[in-house]
Amino acid sequence: MALSGMVTALTVSANPEISPLLSLLEGMSIGLAAGSIIGVLIAYFNILPIIATLGLMNILRGMTYLVSKGKWVSAYQMSTGFKNLSTGTTLGINNLIIFAVIIYIFYSYFINQTKTGRYIYAVGSSPETAELIGIKRRRIILLVYSLMGLLAGLAGVLWVSKFASAQGDTAVGYEMNVIAATVLGGVSVSGGRGRVTGIILGSILFGILANALPLINISPFWQQFIQGIVILAAIISNVLLQRRNERAALKKRAI
């Protein structure tokens, strides 16, 4: 997010006349490239996903500081058209809501109604079994990480557009927020289970929690503590539920 947002902001500041759509495509391309690299590392070099993602995250964060030379890109350096990507409206509806609805519809259909979507669930549940039945496991893994990189690039551009500021530490610490939202939304930490609708509901729930704590004058230090407890409880519940389902499935097979 930080790199795609920063590079796009630098491009916009140097070329104010550039189309906002091209700016969006630039950021998404950067995200797609980053996601593809992670996918290749995991699928073809068998690097653990958490190592590949966190490692490249730090590399890209460093690249963000390098390309920006440690400086910010501020609102006055950005064109009105670019800032309107997030803050503008279409038919009276905020553009961010429109982006969210389009993404939700596309990915809900893709993951639930297409053969590739079913393959993704299969690989998430058991990569080895999926490969035994003819699914190209490596291609599916590469596809998933590429698509997630594409969305991260889009999010980076929209973030910079909304806040009219690009900096090297954009979205630092949001990794845990994303994990919390997905787990609260019912996504299995071991893969193979989850719905786009659940992730949205989990994001809303986590957002309500994060915004409610300051309103009741909870200390920032306690806010982090409480959010951490919620994340941990959600993960434990997720794992216990999955184990219960696995035991139930084994009993059915035995019968």
List each model region and its residues:
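Transmembrane alpha-helical segments in multi-pass inner-membrane proteins
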Residues: G35, Y145, A152, K162-G228
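Alpha-helical transmembrane segments within multi-pass membrane transporters and channels
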Residues: T8, P16-L56, L201-G202
